[in-house]
């Protein structure tokens, strides 16, 4: 492979052809970081952006950074946030409020992680200008015939305008992976089944939907309530819940990370779309009328009285099901999908502020907000970037999965770290067995700390093109991508792939043959963080399938009261465990129901993680065919079975005997923790 570059055909350049060392396609935050890094390493680079703005989501409304563990954000990414802080160090930056009134501005901090969209774009432009990066806007790849490949390498890419960009290396930093796909690189769309990569949080996820983003009240889905023959209201799929863990084509929902203002002098009322249709919001009205009075948005405050506004609750800014075709759609179809999302969200905001079927208390709350007059001034104060949370994902020789996020597998060729929750937004609304509406797809599980991202996951597999890297639509499962897909990580990977591209040029090697040691040395020199923070190490993954006997996880239990999921402890079954928060004593309980599958003596075991803050007097009730045993478990004490399970006793069972185990937090003197239940035949 190393001789391929030397044998590339020499092509004479026309007036419409630009030749550089590295072509970066996609002006996202990753694209900016990649282009800046190439130039700083002394090589020529062109950054091509299909739209009219650079920065992607970072300059498109996502100003409340999903940063995770900030210790693992280094290099160009950290420099960006340091520049943000320096901007807000200037008194002139504070126009609508005083810096002292904004709690997330702390002059002594190394960096600042919240910012206004226009400030982010300005900082990106400054970085590009200082690095002498040539930026070309409004140039879209000819996806049908625009990628020229020779000898297993991308030679040039042609835009719809006819302009040609040739290079020695190419980096696809789009959210959609258009260059990757057009170059014939293998990819996937949708959710894999858990069985594909040995995961627990992928695919269809009904049981995991225990957070805010669901219906808390019974809401009828039929046009005429109670009458299925009348048809469904808008935004509901005519299907049941499905089987957990099965894969499908669905994509987690998109929205606009809307910037709002409540400063009267800088506030524009929410516009009513010309094609407004109140029937799109029938579920919203019915949910309010059922008694759910939560304001269905999540506005996080940024400087100068503005927000980064995200989805929240049962029916909100996420447009479930409206994006399934987007990843592979034509440009024209994508534009239609974006307009549909814009109409949906603008209509939602106008509805919340104005419609008479919205409770007055909600309307009063919403009328204090509007769009900021000084943001997105060329787009009606509306964000120019749809939040494409996930589109195509490359399939390479290394696929980052839940195993990596949980550190049960640790990559040996790190080019950056992730640390945010494995976070999938809902993908659809279905009809429950009881005939009501519910959301599906929401998963929010902490990986329990930072994890390493493999170099092999940002380059194509061997046998595919040898000079294209993909730091955004990288090789990852759906649920792992839910953690990786944060803007700081995209910048980190953009810098790392740019460094690899430069080293491949200098060494005259394919990206797949690049020595990792040299790459690592340069990345560390340039401030990248490549190792786990102190105290983090490889974890043990314990699944139900890996344990003997009949095992029920906490997700299999019936809950009373509000329990909190956690992964803070080092050892647990499945995706985590539950705890009572050491609050609301006597108001929380958990109940498992199981049936014996064999006759004979069986030991019943309870899994929990011990700690000094745990309760010493957890009440557990075991009922076998109505015969009740009351137990007290000291969870300060480490479980005797593998440090994970404690015995709840041995019981003589017959096939089909009914067993009920109930755990309560009544009168407990610390945290009550519940992980799993195991029924084992006695030896």
Protein language model regions, located:
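Conserved N-terminal/central alpha/beta ligand/cofactor-binding core
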Residues: 43-44, 49-146, 188, 196-198, ...
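Extreme N-terminal leader/targeting segments of oxidoreductases
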Residues: 1-22, 41, 137
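Extracytoplasmic
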Residues: 541-683
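Extracellular/periplasmic catalytic domains that process cell-envelope and extracellular macromolecules
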Residues: 16-17, 39-41, 150, 247-251, ...
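Flavin (FAD/FMN)-binding glycine-rich loop and adjacent Rossmann-like elements that form
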Residues: 121, 155, 163-169, 173-544
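Conserved beta-strand-loop-beta-strand element in the redox core of flavoprotein oxidoreductases
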Residues: 146-164
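N-terminal Rossmann-like FAD-binding beta1-loop-alpha1 element of flavoenzymes
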Residues: 22-43
């Amino acid at each position: 492979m190393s001789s391929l570059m030397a044998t590339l055909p020499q092509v004479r350049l026309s007036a419409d052809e630009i030749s550089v060392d590295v072509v970066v396609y996609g002006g996202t935050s990753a694209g900016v970081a990649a282009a800046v890094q190439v130039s700083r390493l002394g090589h020529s680079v062109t950054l091509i952006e299909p739209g009219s703005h650079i920065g992607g989501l970072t300059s498109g409304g996502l100003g409340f950074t999903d940063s995770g563990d900030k210790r693992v954000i280094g290099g160009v990414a950290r420099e960006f946030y340091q520049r943000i802080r320096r901007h807000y160090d200037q008194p002139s930056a504070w126009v609508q409020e005083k810096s002292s009134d904004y709690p997330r501005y702390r002059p002594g901090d190394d960096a600042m992680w919240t910012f206004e969209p226009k400030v982010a774009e300005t900082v990106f432009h400054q970085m590009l200008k200082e690095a002498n990066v040539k930026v070309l806007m409004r140039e879209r790849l000819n996806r049908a015939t625009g990628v020229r490949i020779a000898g297993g390498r991308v030679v040039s890419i042609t835009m719809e305008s006819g302009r040609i960009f040739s290079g020695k290396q190419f980096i696809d930093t789009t959210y959609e992976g258009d260059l990757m796909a057009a170059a014939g690189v293998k990819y996937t769309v949708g959710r894999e089944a858990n069985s594909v990569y040995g995961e627990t949080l992928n695919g269809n996820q009904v049981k995991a939907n225990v957070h805010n983003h669901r219906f808390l009240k019974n809401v009828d889905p039929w046009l005429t309530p109670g009458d299925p023959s009348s048809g469904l209201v808008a935004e509901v799929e005519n299907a049941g819940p499905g089987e957990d863990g099965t894969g499908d084509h669905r994509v987690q929902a998109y929205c606009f990370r809307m910037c709002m203002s409540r400063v009267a002098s800088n506030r524009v009322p929410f516009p009513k779309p010309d094609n407004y249709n109140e029937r799109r919001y029938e579920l919203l009205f019915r949910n309010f009328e059922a008694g759910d009075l939560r304001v269905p948005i999540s506005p996080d405050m940024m400087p100068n009285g503005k927000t980064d506004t995200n989805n929240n609750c049962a029916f909100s800014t996420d447009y479930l099901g409206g994006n399934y075709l987007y990843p592979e759609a034509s440009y024209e179809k994508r534009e239609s999908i974006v307009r549909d999302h814009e109409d949906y969200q603008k209509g939602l905001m106008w509805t919340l502020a104005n419609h008479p079927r919205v409770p007055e208390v909600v309307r009063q709350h919403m009328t204090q907000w509007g769009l900021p007059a000084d943001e997105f001034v060329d787009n009606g104060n509306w964000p120019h970037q749809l939040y494409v949370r996930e589109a195509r994902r490359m399939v390479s020789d290394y696929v980052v999965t839940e195993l990596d996020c949980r550190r049960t597998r640790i990559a040996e060729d790190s080019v950056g770290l992730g640390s945010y929750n494995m976070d999938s937004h809902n993908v659809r609304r279905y009809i429950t067995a009881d005939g009501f509406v519910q959301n599906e797809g929401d998963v929010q599980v902490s990986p329990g700390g930072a994890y390493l991202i493999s170099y092999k996951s940002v380059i194509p597999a061997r046998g595919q093109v040898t000079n294209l890297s993909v730091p955004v639509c990288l090789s990852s499962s759906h649920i792992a991508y839910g953690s990786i897909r944060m803007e700081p990580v995209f910048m980190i990977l953009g810098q790392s792939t740019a460094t690899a591209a430069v080293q491949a040029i200098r060494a005259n090697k394919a990206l797949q043959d690049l020595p990792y040691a040299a790459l690592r040395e340069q990345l560390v020199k340039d401030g990248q963080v490549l190792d786990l923070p102190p105290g983090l190490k490889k974890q043990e993954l314990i699944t139900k399938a890996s344990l003997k006997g009949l095992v029920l996880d906490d997700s299999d239990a019936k809950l009373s009261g509000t329990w909190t999921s956690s992964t803070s402890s080092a050892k647990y079954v499945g995706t985590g465990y539950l705890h009572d928060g050491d609050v609301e004593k006597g108001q929380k309980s958990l109940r498992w129901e199981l049936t014996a599958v064999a006759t004979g003596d069986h030991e019943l075991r309870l899994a929990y993680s011990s700690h000094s803050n745990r309760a010493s007097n957890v009440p557990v009730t075991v009922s076998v065919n109505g015969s009740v045993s009351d137990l007290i478990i000291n969870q300060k004490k480490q479980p005797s079975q593998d440090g994970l399970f404690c015995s709840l006793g041995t019981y003589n069972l017959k096939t089909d005997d009914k067993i009920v185990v109930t755990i309560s937090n009544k009168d407990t003197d610390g945290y009550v923790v519940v992980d799993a239940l195991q029924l084992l035949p006695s030896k």
